[in-house]
Structures are given as C-alpha cells and as structure tokens.
C-alpha cells in the first residue's frame, strides 16, 4: 500500500535524518519569526545557537541543508538583507576561491601524496618514529595545502592497505566485503584487531598534524585567510606573527605524539603486525614493478608543481585561489588529464563546504545587523590589554570546540576589526588579538570532530567503520592533544606573544600598518 502524501513529504524532508532532528528544525523555523517580532536581539542569538546545533549534529545531516533553511528564513523575516549577505560574500571572495581552486588543485597531486605516505608506512619500522613522521608530514603539507585533502590522502592509503590485508584474511579475493568479518579465519582476527588499532592511531596523529601545521600559515585553514585579510598580512607576515604561539605548540604536540605512543595511553601504541607488513610489502613490490615511465614522469611533474605552489605562496605572487587555479591547469595539462568529467571530480570535495561557508556569511551578516556580539566585545574590551588576549583566546577556543572554527574565527575577527576602526583598541593591540583569535579557533578545536573539518571528514569517511573509529573514541584519542595544545597555546598567548612580537618588530622582521 502506498504511503500518504503527508508521509511522503515528511520522508523527503531532510531525507534519512532522524525524525526528532526534522521536528527540531521545523520548530526552529516556526518560532523564529515570532521571537524576532518580540525581541530581535534574543531572536538573533537563538538563530546562532540553532546554527551551532546544526553544525554539532553534522553526522545527522550535512549542515548546509538545515543551516541554509535558517539563513533563508533570516533574510525573509528581516534579520539581515540579501544585499548585506552579498557584501559579506564579496568581502570573502578570496576564501571561496581558496576552497574551490586550491582543494581541487591538490586533488591532481594525490598520486605524489599517496606515494609519500606509502613509503613512510613501509619504510619505517619503529611505531614511535612512524607516528612522528605521519604527524610531521601532515603538519608540513597542511601548512601549504588544504587539511581536508591531506586527510583524504591518508584515508586513501589506509583504506587501500586495510582492503589488501582483509582480502587475504578472509580468503575471498575480489569478492571481499571489507565490512564483513564473518569469513575471517579465527587466527587472523587478533591480527586484524591489532591492525585496526594501528591504523586508528596513525589517522589521529595525521589528523592532529593537520591542525598543528594548519594554524601556522594563512592558507592552512580557511579562517586563517579571513584573519590575514582583515589584518592586511601576507604569507611571511602571518607565519612570523603566529610563530611565538605556533612553534612552541608544534614542539609540544610532537612530544605528546611520542609520549602517548611510548606509554600506550588513550588507545595509542599498537604496532603494525609482521604478518600484515609482509602482505603489504609484497603488494607494494608488485605495484612498483608495474609502474611505467609515464607514471614516474607524472610523479616528477607533481613534485615540481608542489615546489611552484610553495614558492608562489611564500612570495605572494598571486591571490591564493588563483595560485590554486594555476596548479589545476599545470597538473592537468602536464599529466594528461583532459576529460571534463575527470576534472569535475576534483571539485566534488570542496564545493559543498564552499556552499556551507556562504551560509556562514549569511549568519555573520545577521550577527552584524543585530549587534549580537556587542555585549561580549564590550566586556572583553573593558579588561586590560593583556587580559584581552587571554579572553579572546578562551572564548574562541570554547566555541570552536563545539562549532566550526571557520564560523567562529570569522565572527571574532570582524568584531575585533570593528573595535579597532571605532578607536576602542589600537592597531598594535588588534594585531595581537588577531593572533589570539587564529590560535584560539585552531588549537582547542581538535577536541571534537565538530570543530575541525578534517576530523569530521575522517569520522564520516568509509574508513571510520572499518577501523572502528567512533565519535566517542575520536574524542578520547584527541584528549591528550586537546589538553596540551590548548594549555600551551594559552600560556604562549599570555606570556610570549607580546614580547616576541615587539622583538620581531624592532628587529625589522615585521611591518606594522600605520
């Protein structure tokens, strides 16, 4: 018997999302206009809370859909205007270009990145050294590339290796279902569980590595570029200004990586079983024999393009998004990717998040029009200049651990810049606050998958169920990093940021706008 029209509409609305989630969103959409009529300020804060809720529930439904509905309603009922949304989007065009073109550009360098991580995995026998190598490699790559892409590459390596061993363990060949363990021989099951633990720890080290490297440069994370643009910094300026906080945090993060592996704390410490290593090494040897001269030239070309990418970013030869576009053109032209559909696949990863970021800017427009953060900013600005840095760092960190750090960073840098333009703070203080905001949004956000897009990508990937990586387990494994990164970042913001910045300015390394 066919279902009713009403039931059919209900099932279509937000698709497979739970009924309670659909109902919650409908309640939001119904009550918002009435609350806005009664008290626009309260309605604005309610909208922000609802939007953060959709980000926190990203596993139930991709936030673009519910967040987009809330944003559309906000424009319709007058919380902001379509013209203001357009202005916010136009002001952040560089960030949108970064997401569209840089992420797509790195897609065409995946073969090189896969080659690097595969060599690391099979060449290094010490688990501690291997974990450190994965963390450092992810940090370095994320400083110049998109963190999502770096994590995607590591996921590809892990899924590939897991599938190779699972086929051997189940004796099912090409018909093997990686999610089905029913055909695994009993003596292989223990080895498989150890292999899962090994992959889980490597994925978490790599994920944290992207956060450690991503905070250091203006292209490491989308919000970095927003903050850099607001402060008028180029690539070198940004790196130097962040370094009093980010360099000590990087060192302590790497020490944490070694410590948890050595002590086998928080689910770390599993080694690669020898049986698995033998199978993977055999497969890699066969793959290397099959590699043609054409394949080798592709790897060389991608490496050269990587050098161009780093050089162009460091010397600021063009806007970041345009450098990404040049990578797309060079990588496709020189490696023989000429089919439109093959090129189109590169954009599937970035465009949903680009659309979501545009929705972020709609909510930011509401925050500006309704002056939602005015009381918080006034409270912070009443404190001493030294205390302001700590408060901005903590407020950013708290929000970023439960919400998306791009959203949080955008809000706070806009408010800080408005305070500077109104004469509430000096330019020098604004530049220090920009560092506190950037580090505050990036470092504590490793606490949960909600804050770091790369972590959320890992949690929702095909790999997560294979290696038994759940939301709770991810939070638990991230906990030592969360504590160390947050505390060291806070101490550096409080004690080393201002004097180190002053020293670099006097040494002529930094130029302050006047």
UniProtKB/Swiss-Prot annotation:
Coiled coil: none annotated. It is found in: Cell inner membrane. GO terms for molecular function: sodium:proton antiporter activity. It catalyses: 2 Na(+)(in) + 3 H(+)(out) = 2 Na(+)(out) + 3 H(+)(in). It is a multi-pass membrane protein. Pfam families: NhaB. The chain crosses the membrane at residues 23-43, 63-83, 97-117, 120-140, 144-164, 202-222, 238-258, 303-323, 357-377, 391-411, 447-467, 475-495. GO terms for cellular component: plasma membrane. Keywords: Antiport, Cell inner membrane, Cell membrane, Ion transport, Membrane, Sodium, Sodium transport, Transmembrane, Transmembrane helix, Transport. PANTHER family: NA(+)_H(+) ANTIPORTER NHAB (PTHR43302:SF1), TRANSPORTER ARSB-RELATED (PTHR43302). HAMAP family: NhaB (MF_01599). Na(+)/H(+) antiporter that extrudes sodium in exchange for external protons. Belongs to the NhaB Na(+)/H(+) (TC 2.A.34) antiporter family. This is Na(+)/H(+) antiporter NhaB. It comes from Salmonella agona (strain SL483). The gene is nhaB.
């Amino acid at each position: 018997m066919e279902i009713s029209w009403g039931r059919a509409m209900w099932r279509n609305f937000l698709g497979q999302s739970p009924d309670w989630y659909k109902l919650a969103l409908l309640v939001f959409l119904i009550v918002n206009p009435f609350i806005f009529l009664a008290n626009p300020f309260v309605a604005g804060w309610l909208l922000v809370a609802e939007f953060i809720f959709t980000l926190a529930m990203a596993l139930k439904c991709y936030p673009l859909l519910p967040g987009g509905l809330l944003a559309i309603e906000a424009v319709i009922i007058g919380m902001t205007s379509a013209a203001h949304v357009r202005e916010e989007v136009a002001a952040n065009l560089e960030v949108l270009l970064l997401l569209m073109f840089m992420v797509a550009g790195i897609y065409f360098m995946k073969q090189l990145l896969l080659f690097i991580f595969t060599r690391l995995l099979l060449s290094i026998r010490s688990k501690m050294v291997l974990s450190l190598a994965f963390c450092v490699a992810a940090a370095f790559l994320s400083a110049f590339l998109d963190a999502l892409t770096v994590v995607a590459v590591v996921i590809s390596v892990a899924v590939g290796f897991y599938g190779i061993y699972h086929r051997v363990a189940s004796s099912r060949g090409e018909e093997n279902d990686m999610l089905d363990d029913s055909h695994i021989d009993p003596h292989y099951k223990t080895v498989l569980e150890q292999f899962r633990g090994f992959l889980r720890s490597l994925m978490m080290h790599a994920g944290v590595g992207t956060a450690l490297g991503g905070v250091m440069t203006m292209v490491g994370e989308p919000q970095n570029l927003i903050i850099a643009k607001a402060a008028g910094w180029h690539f070198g300026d940004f790196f130097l200004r962040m370094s009093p906080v980010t360099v000590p945090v990087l060192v302590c993060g790497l020490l944490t990586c070694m410590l948890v592996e050595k002590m086998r704390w928080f689910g770390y410490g599993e080694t690669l079983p020898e049986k698995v290593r033998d199978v993977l090494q055999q497969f890699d040897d066969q793959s290397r024999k099959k590699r043609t001269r054409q394949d080798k030239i592709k790897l060389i070309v991608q490496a050269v393009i990587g050098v161009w990418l780093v050089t162009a970013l460091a010397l600021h030869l063009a806007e970041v998004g345009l450098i990404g576009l040049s990578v797309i053109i060079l990588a496709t032209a020189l490696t023989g990717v000429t089919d439109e559909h093959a090129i189109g696949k590169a954009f599937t990863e970035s465009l949903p998040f680009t659309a979501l970021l545009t929705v972020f800017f709609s909510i930011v427009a509401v925050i500006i029009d309704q002056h939602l953060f005015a009381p918080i900013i006034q409270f912070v600005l009443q404190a001493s200049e030294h205390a302001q840095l700590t408060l901005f760092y903590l407020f950013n960190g708290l929000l970023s651990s439960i919400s998306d750090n791009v959203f949080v960073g955008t809000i706070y840098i806009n408010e800080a810049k408005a305070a500077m333009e109104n004469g509430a703070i000096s330019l020098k203080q604004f530049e220090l606050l920009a560092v506190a905001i950037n580090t505050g949004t990036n470092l504590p956000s490793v606490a949960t998958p909600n804050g770091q897009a790369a972590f959320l990508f890992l949690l929702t990937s095909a790999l997560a169920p294979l290696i038994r990586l759940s939301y709770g387990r991810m939070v638990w494994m991230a906990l030592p990093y969360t504590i160390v990164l947050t505390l060291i970042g806070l101490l550096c913001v409080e004690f080393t940021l201002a004097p180190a910045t002053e020293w670099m300015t006097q040494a002529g390394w930094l130029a302050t706008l006047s």
